[in-house]
Amino acid sequence: RKKIVDETLAEMGAKVIKEERTLPYSLRYEIDYDTKDLLDFSQRIESIPGVEILSMGKSLEVIKDLGNAKMVCDRYSLDKVVGTHAIGHARMATESGVDIKSAHPFWGYPFSDVSVVHNGQLTNYWNNRRVLENKGMRFMSECDSELIAVYIAEKMRHGATLEEGMKESLTGLDGVFTYFVATKDSLGCLLYTSPSPRD
């Protein structure tokens, strides 16, 4: 598969600056590519059988895996990562799958540089997902945390600031939840409990 990925990157005009096999099932690429159409780029790469992009960004890298925080840190040498901020979440899945796709953090596919970790439950997940899918968004899992990432990224794609997108989520998302968002230059946190019908 790696050979096919490399050939596809070359066909698309992407120049590989650095590549690293972090684990037998994981590759990390740093590429130079004209990112006018990230959706087309990601769809071409993911059309390769058995290949999935777990994150893609100019300034933000999402590292996802199964295991506790120390295991993931050791696997990916996170103690050597240089950056200004990070978010992470070790959790026990209760509603979603237990696989790398469903692990936190989530990015706003196909919009780079927006990442989310979340605790809680969205009660209007399927309604919001259908709305976003009808706008052309694609989901990699059935985890409601991913919906928050796509929701915020879609708002920012249309000109909202992180703060504005998060404020819009107060009326657009329903449930009891807390989430953190990281962008290339910002961090945001929101704690929300839906008003009681008696209020």
Language-model-detected regions and their locations in the chain:
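N-terminus-centric sequence/structural signature that marks the extreme N-terminus
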Residues: 1-154, 191
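Catalytic core of PPM/PP2C metal-dependent serine/threonine phosphatase domains
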Residues: 158-191
